[in-house]
C-alpha cells in the first residue's frame, strides 16, 4: 500500500551547489571523476528515477548549468545549506504545486543510493514530515526529503538564528531518519554518502569508483 508520498518518482530533485569549495581550491562541481564532471554525474544519478527535471541551486553567476534550471538562493549571503533547501521549497511551491516534498542532494557525493528518494519517502506519514539519510551513525541532512509546508518557518529561522545549525532547525520538526548500509566493494566497505571536499578525497573517490566497477 502506498505511503503518504504515493509516487516517489514525482518528488522534485535539487542539487545543492551553493558552497564555497574552499578546501578543494576549485569549484567541485567541475572536477572530473571517472572522466565525467561531478555536476553531470550527480545530476544523472539523482535524475534516473525522477520524472521531474533536476534543478540546480547555485550562485546566479554559475558558469555552466549544463541545461539544468538555475535557482539561486532566495536569501543572499551564503547562509548555509538550509538556504538552498529553502530556495528549493520556494521553487517547488511555484513550479510543482502538486508536490508536498522535494529531495536535495549535494554536488560532492557521487555514490549515494540510486533508490535514495524511494527509501526516504517510505517513512513519511504527513505533509510536514522531514526525512534525512544516515549512515555509520552519522546524519546527512543534505540528503533529505523536505516538506514545502515548512518554508515560512525555515525562512524565519534562517533570518533569526545567527548560528544556523542544521540540527537546531531539525529539532523544531518531526524528522524521520533512514539508515543506509555501506556498499561492499573490492577494496572494502564504502560509505554511500562519502563526499569530496579536498583533492585527496577526489583521489580516494577514483579508487572507490574503480573498485565499484570491479565488484560483481
Curated annotation (Swiss-Prot):
Its EC number is 2.7.7.77. The keyword Metal-binding applies. It comes from the Bacteria. It catalyses: Mo-molybdopterin + GTP + H(+) = Mo-molybdopterin guanine dinucleotide + diphosphate. It is found in: Cytoplasm. One of its GO terms (molecular function) is metal ion binding. Mg(2+) binds at residue 108. Belongs to the MobA family. Transfers a GMP moiety from GTP to Mo-molybdopterin (Mo-MPT) cofactor (Moco or molybdenum cofactor) to form Mo-molybdopterin guanine dinucleotide (Mo-MGD) cofactor. This is Molybdenum cofactor guanylyltransferase. The lineage of its organism: Bacteria, Pseudomonadati, Pseudomonadota, Alphaproteobacteria, Hyphomicrobiales. The gene is mobA.
Amino acid at each position: 500500500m502506498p505511503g503518504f508520498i504515493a509516487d516517489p518518482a514525482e518528488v522534485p530533485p535539487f542539487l545543492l551547489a551553493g558552497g564555497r569549495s574552499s578546501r578543494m581550491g576549485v569549484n567541485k562541481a567541475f572536477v572530473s571523476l571517472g572522466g565525467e564532471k561531478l555536476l553531470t554525474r550527480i545530476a544523472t544519478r539523482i535524475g534516473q528515477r525522477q520524472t521531474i527535471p533536476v534543478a540546480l541551486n547555485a550562485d546566479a553567476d554559475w558558469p555552466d548549468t549544463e541545461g539544468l534550471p538555475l535557482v539561486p538562493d532566495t536569501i543572499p549571503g551564503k547562509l548555509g545549506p538550509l538556504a538552498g533547501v529553502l530556495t528549493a521549497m520556494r521553487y517547488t511551491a511555484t513550479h510543482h504545486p502538486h508536490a508536498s516534498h522535494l529531495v536535495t542532494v549535494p554536488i560532492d557525493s557521487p555514490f549515494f543510493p540510486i533508490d535514495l528518494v524511494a527509501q526516504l519517502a517510505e517513512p513519511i506519514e504527513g505533509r510536514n514530515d522531514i526525512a534525512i539519510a544516515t549512515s555509520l551513525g552519522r546524519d546527512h541532512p543534505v540528503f533529505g526529503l523536505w516538506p514545502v509546508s515548512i518554508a515560512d518557518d525555515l525562512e524565519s529561522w534562517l533570518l533569526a538564528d545567527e548560528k544556523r545549525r542544521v540540527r537546531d532547525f531539525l529539532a523544531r520538526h518531526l524528522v524521520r531518519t533512514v539508515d543506509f548500509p555501506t556498499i561492499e566493494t573490492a577494496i572494502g566497505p564504502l560509505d554511500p554518502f562519502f563526499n569530496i571536499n579536498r583533492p585527496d578525497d577526489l583521489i580516494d573517490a577514483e579508487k572507490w569508483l574503480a573498485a565499484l566497477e570491479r565488484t560483481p
